[in-house]
Curated annotation (Swiss-Prot):
It comes from the Bacteria. GO terms for cellular component: membrane. Pathway: Lipid metabolism; sphingolipid metabolism. Signal peptide: none annotated. Transmembrane segments: none annotated. The lineage of its organism: Bacteria, Pseudomonadati, Pseudomonadota, Alphaproteobacteria, Caulobacterales. Involved in de novo bacterial ceramide synthesis. Residues 6-83 form the Carrier domain. Belongs to the acyl carrier protein (ACP) family. InterPro entries: ACP-like_sf (IPR036736), PP-bd_ACP (IPR009081). This is Probable acyl carrier protein CCNA_01221.
C-alpha cells in the first residue's frame, strides 16, 4: 500500500518541478509555502504551473477548486484528491 505522505511528497516535488520550469528559476517548495508570497507566483504563472501539473498527473484541475488553494500543500492535496477520483 502506498503511504499518503509518499504521495504528498511526490506531488510537492512535481509542483516544484513545474514551478521551476514555468518561472525559469529554482524553486524550493514545502507544504507550507504560500504560492503567491513565498514562491512569488502571479496568476498567469500559476495557470501555467497548473497546466504543467495537469499534463504530469493526467488530470483536469477545475478552476473553481483553485480559489481555496493558498499553499503548495493545498495544491498537493487537491491534486491527490483528483488523482484518487480519476
Amino acid at each position: 500500500m502506498i503511504r499518503m505522505d509518499t504521495v504528498t511528497d511526490l506531488s510537492l516535488r512535481e509542483i516544484g518541478v513545474a514551478a521551476t520550469k514555468v518561472l525559469g528559476r529554482a524553486v524550493e517548495v514545502r507544504a507550507e509555502s504560500h504560492i503567491g508570497r513565498d514562491l512569488a507566483v502571479d496568476s498567469l504563472a500559476l495557470m501555467n504551473i497548473i497546466m504543467e501539473l495537469e499534463d504530469t498527473f493526467d488530470i483536469s484541475i477545475p478552476l473553481d477548486r483553485l480559489a481555496s488553494v493558498e499553499t503548495a500543500g493545498d495544491l498537493s492535496k487537491l491534486i491527490n484528491d483528483l488523482r484518487t477520483r480519476a
